[in-house]
UniProtKB/Swiss-Prot annotation:
Residues reported to bind nicotinamide: 94-95
Subcellular location: Cytoplasm
Name of the protein described by the UniProt record: NAD-dependent protein deacetylase 2
GO cellular component, one term: cytoplasm
Gene from which this protein is expressed: cobB2
Positions that bind Zn(2+): 120, 123, 145, 148
Length: 241
């Protein structure tokens, strides 16, 4: 490959498993082991039940994502940007590890939001997750918004919520414009994010799928890689510029 193509990287949970963050939908994922756990991140249940909120905050407090460090896959994406290759990251992950690895925040679209912030469902006030977790540690079960008293939630897209249409629109535009679309660590089963791969192919991009399990888009892909992401993604990206 010659030149420096625009590379769009759709990253899913599999990218962060080497950082100790579980793949919730995988064979041993939390949603399969404990279907009741989905209630903790389902908007209707969360808003309607203080006990669900209490348990949800405890889950956030104990989450591996808050203490995780970037792994080789995250660093490989950051290195691609440092080498001057035009790259945009469209991530389904909420852990913020792409940015911690050194990818410019303006190059990352967090399709499902971020677990590093909280937002008030009443007034929209936003702040660091760490501040709310400090209140949990101090003894609050269900800390309300300090501005309006409203219900606080993580700044992620819960089940039952819509993705931000502005973010999704920008992701679609990037998918249409890119020359290479890499889907890595994602089952490509969650819409509308998964459909970005089809958008890219329909607009002439080369599609590369890097995932342990088969995906619905493998037949559309120019290349399918089943090797471990921590070694496969760095090797792939080294060849792109």
């Amino acid at each position: 490959m010659t030149g420096k193509p625009l590379v769009a990287i759709l990253s899913g949970a599999g990218v962060s498993t080497d950082s100790g963050i579980p793949d919730y939908r995988g064979p041993n994922g939390l949603w399969r082991r404990d279907p009741e756990a989905e209630k903790l991140v389902t908007y209707e249940y969360y808003m309607g039940d203080p006990e669900i909120r209490r348990r949800s905050w405890l889950m956030r407090r104990d989450s591996a994502a808050l203490h995780a460090e970037p792994n080789a896959a995250h660093r490989a994406v950051a290195d691609l940007e440092r080498r001057g290759v035009p790259v945009r990251v469209l991530t389904q992950n909420v852990d913020g590890l792409h940015q911690l690895a050194g990818v410019s925040a303006r190059k990352v679209l967090e399709l499902h939001g971020t677990a590093r912030d909280c937002v008030c469902t009443g007034c929209g006030a936003r702040g660091p997750m760490a501040d709310v977790l400090a209140r949990i540690e101090a003894g609050e079960d269900d800390p309300p918004c300090l501005d309006c008293g409203g219900v606080l939630k993580t700044a992620t897209v819960m089940f039952g919520e819509r993705l931000d249409p502005v973010v999704l629109g920008e992701a679609a535009a990037i998918s249409k414009a890119c020359q290479v679309f890499v889907a890595v660590g994602t089952s490509l089963q969650v819409e509308p994010a998964a459909g970005l791969a089809r958008v890219a192919v329909e607009h002439g991009a080369r599609l590369v799928v890097v995932n342990a399990e088969p995906t619905p888009y493998d037949e559309l892909a120019d290349e399918v890689i089943r090797e471990p992401i921590g070694s496969a993604l760095p090797a792939l990206l080294r060849g792109l510029g």
